[in-house]
Amino acid sequence: MTTKLALSSTPEGIVPALLAHLNSLDVETMLGFYDPEGLIVDAAGVAHVGKEAIGKELAKYFSLGLQMSITQRHLFVAGDVASLILDWSYIGTARDGTKINMVATATDIARRGPDGLWRYLIDNPFGSMQRGAA
């Protein structure tokens, strides 16, 4: 069931809004958190652009049925752009009975829209993970 959750009007409110959207476990609800030009980067480093592609990636996480935990490490703001470094985890037993211990550090970018609300422009959940030769 799609729920319209509030977006943040301040940079400091981005993470609480993100967590509420993520833990809805609803792809359509979470898609409302993304900028129209947004993208998500998968664990292999591939960028998925557009609502349909982002939705497919989100569905993989939401299928676990777990609530995400997030600790904000850094928030830097320059005008209408915010850089976030977030430690996150999915820990528990997935819907299929699999034990999950997924922990990573995200490097994300949010942008304030013309309506004054912050949305994710770049969602890079495995941002600090080394992905091979540069």
Model-derived regions, located:
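A beta-strand edge to alpha-helix "cap/lid" segment located at domain peripheries
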Residues: 2-29, 39-134
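Short glycine-dipeptide loop
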Residues: 36
